[in-house]
Each structure stands twice: as C-alpha cells, then as structure tokens.
C-alpha cells in the first residue's frame, strides 16, 4: 500500500510527530527555565561583569546592581560563575538552609601559597580536616576562658596606648596606625608569648600578603590561563614572602619546643600557654584526640589565620567607631558620660570594669552594622542545589553582601544614620539562634561563622572605653567634617587614616 503526500494518513502522522516534538521541546524549555541561573546584569564576552568593578568598592557596586537585578543575582567574573545574596532571606538560604551545600570557600591562589595549600581553617575545604580545625579553635584556642586568660596582655598594651596618646601633648595623632600597632602587639604576644623574633619584619610580611591577596586577581578569575601566574608576578612574590615567614616561624616554634622541654611551662605571661604552646601540645597528642596529620605547616597556617584575621578586624572596628562618634558628637557625649560615671575617677581600668557599659556595647553593635569586618562573606557551592527556583551548579562562588543587608531600608529605619539605640531591645545577636533574623551578620553565620567573636570584641571594647574615658576628641585644624570614604577592595577599611587631636580629661 502506498501513501501519497496529500493522503489523510500522512497528514495525521506528521501532525502527531509535530505535536510530539513540540511537547518534547516545550518540556526541555520548561525544564531549562526551572534550572536557570538567577538574573543578573548584562555581560561582556570573555570578561563578563568585571568591567563594572573598575576602581570601585566591590560591595557598594554589588548593592547597586542588586537594586536593579534582585536579592539573588548572577555575575560572570571572567571564567568564574558567581551568585550574590543581598537580602536576609537569601543570606539565610546560603548560611542555614543550604549551609552544607555552601560549606566550602572559594579558591584564592595567593592564600594557597601562604596557608601551605589551605591547611588553615579560613579557606580549607569543608570536610574531616576542617571539622577537626574548628574543634581546635572552639575547644582550645578561643574558648571564653582562654580569651579571659589573655586579659593582662590587652590591659598592658592598651594602657601603653593611652600613655602614647598622652605624650602627643595635644598634637594631631594617627589613631589608625596607633590602633593597628597596638592590636598587632597584642595578637603577637598572645600567639608567641615572650619568644623574641623579628616582629616588625614579620608584621610587614603579613601586610604584604594581605595587599597581594586582596581584591579580584586575574589568576583567580581566569584559572585556565596559566600564563597569568607569570604575567601578574604575584605568585613569585608570595613564594619569596612565604620563605621569609617560614624562617621566622620555624625559629619561634623551635624555641617554644626547647623552652617547654626545659621548663615544663608555657611561653606566655606567668608561664601560661600561648597559642604556639597550645598547638604544639595538640601536635604531641594533647587532649583532643585528633585523627588528622598535624605538624609544623599546620601550625603555621593556623597562626597566619589568627594574626592576619585578628589584627585588621579589631583595629578597623575601633577606627570606624571613633569616626562615627566624631560625626555624631551626641553619641560620643552619651558614651563618655556612661563610662566616666561608671569609672568615677578610677585611674587604672581593667576588663572587668567594662562589662556593664551597656551604651558602649550598643555603639559597637551599630558600628559593625555599618562597617562589618567582612562586608562580603564568601562561600562556594559544593553540591548542586536550588535557591528560589534557580539552579546553582557545583563550583559556583557565592557572595553574601553583609554591608548591603546592614544598610537596607526595608529592615533598618534611617539605615545610613548612626543610631546605637536601635539595638537597645536586644533583637539582634552576633550568633544566630534558631529563629533569629539574618539582617545582622557582622561575623557571618552557619558552619563558617567566625570562631573568634569573643576574642575580637575584647580587642574593641577595652580600647574604646579607654579612649572615651581618658580623652576628649576633636578633628585637626578646626575641621567640622570627616571624610568617611572606604578603601577600594574587599575589606571595609577607611581610605584615609583617622587623624585626631586628643586632650586629656581631667
């Protein structure tokens, strides 16, 4: 039997085929739509959205882009696919609902070198080793008891800071540099105790690393272009710096071992353990029953985290708190009144004296809302998942714009104003409880939340209390305005150092 082109059978058959194909195509389109990436700004060939970040503060640009593209948007940063969360709901999805799926950190080549191939806690991939490191920090290095044991170091160093400011005799001082130096000294004594080493050289090397690792680097954005490692020149410099740091830290560790073997005591104040002592005890078996390799390189990687992370975050927070109070003198007056009434002429101020300074704590909370230590939290997707119906592939970088969330008028009335009283009802916490809103994330959330909150706050509360108790403050040259420009980069630092004049409070 033959069927002609015009026969009803051929027509019906073709119709069925057309319908079947149409249904298949429609299903693929619908399926594809349900697995699309979040919306985002238009992208250029090869570089994607990189052109939109030139010369700008990244988290500010991301806030502006989110206002046009939504609270979850997609960016193409060279070869890197990234999503950006700019609302509490999206932040909660990444750090709580899908916390395990986003438990990794992005690969940063500069930090791979100086952390001994990610042996540190900050950038090590989530897994057994990382969980053991978290255990070390939570149960040994940064317990509340351990942080309190270092209080004499903080009290001595901040007392010296007051003396240094007094010696300026009313001349302009660079408070930013003084705070950084003071905090550096505290962190190094906490870590290394009484062991002598090339402190200034070591601090300079750490600062060089932070400068080389900051911002978006071509080697991270175009990982398949290996020649960029050579052209950018960063890798060679970092290996040179790591070699110098190795020599310093190996000597410090050897001296700790020798002292412990000889005296049976720690290298800290009054024979107590410093951070290196604790890590060496853990290496030798300790009390934690670890099931991971743990040697010199592991110790050095963790020391890098503590020193690099602890110094900048605390000193920057004090910098911004003083800056905001200079712009809001009524806040400074209220804080000074509380402190001076509480201390009532007391000459030596100790950490125990500041525990009930409620308004000072509100000032710090408000400072961290406007100027979070890590304005962009970085995660990486390790298991494919969906957020709001959007498909997120494995390897996608995730940025949580903490800076933008803390300034969103939908959650914060008068968000650009410095109003410590907004925290008076204890609605917001540094740690996230089960039902807590995610509008406030100065230390992150979830598995990757900062383990050093109490240590960091201790290095902010006491110096602020002392600065406000002992001195009255004014801007140099009779200025009435203060430049609050933020530095270009991923950290929330002031672009210009804070210069102030202090007069002793009689």
UniProtKB/Swiss-Prot annotation:
What induces this protein's gene, according to its Swiss-Prot or TrEMBL record? Up-regulated by herbivory.
The keyword Oxidoreductase belongs to this UniProt entry's keyword annotation:
yes
What does the entry list as the binding residues for heme?
A: 450
The tissues where this chain's protein is expressed are given as: Expressed in leaf epidermis.
Q: Where in the cell is it found?
A: Endoplasmic reticulum membrane
Which CDD domains does its entry note? CYP71-like
Membrane-spanning residues: 6-26
One annotated GO molecular function: NAD+ binding
| Enzyme Commission code | 1.14.14.50
> What are the coiled-coil residue ranges?
none
* Annotated membrane topology: Single-pass membrane protein
- Top-level taxon in the UniProt lineage: Eukaryota
- Pathway noted in the entry: Alkaloid biosynthesis; vindoline biosynthesis
Q: Which UniProt keywords apply?
A: Alkaloid metabolism, Endoplasmic reticulum, Heme, Iron, Membrane, Metal-binding, Monooxygenase, Oxidoreductase, Transmembrane, Transmembrane helix
Record PANTHER family:
OS06G0641600 PROTEIN, OS08G0105600 PROTEIN
**Family indicated by similarity:** Belongs to the cytochrome P450 family.
Protein name stated in the entry: Tabersonine 3-oxygenase
Species this protein is from: Catharanthus roseus (Madagascar periwinkle)
